[in-house]
Amino acid sequence: DHAHAARPDARAKITKAPSSYLKKLYFDTIVFNDHQLAYLVKQYGADHILLGTDYPYDMGLPDAVQFVRKTPGLSERDRGLILGGNAARLLGIKPPAARLARR
């Protein structure tokens, strides 16, 4: 953001500070370290993080769901968003819990 504010040439192609565009990005949980996942949640919000598996490649986490469940400092709401709530919202589908509650 500093260069954008300080240099006119940095503003030639983008009208807003670079950090404002980060709000449009989504991140996945393939960070391999619970501290990094907690940082993503703190920096960008749990509503911008999706469960990642790295499938079909072999470099993913052995159990991506447990990784999210065991990451310290995440609320149950955070976990719910990351483990499917965000994907459901982005895809325009009802999360499984909402569908089951209607039965």
Can you annotate each of these PLM segments?
Residues 1-22:
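Aromatic-lined glycan-binding groove of carbohydrate-active enzymes
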Residues 15, 20-21, 38, 49-51:
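Generic detection of intrinsically disordered/low-complexity segments and helix-coil linkers/edges
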Residues 26-27, 31-50, 56-103:
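Mid-to-C-terminal alpha-helical segments outside catalytic/metal-binding sites
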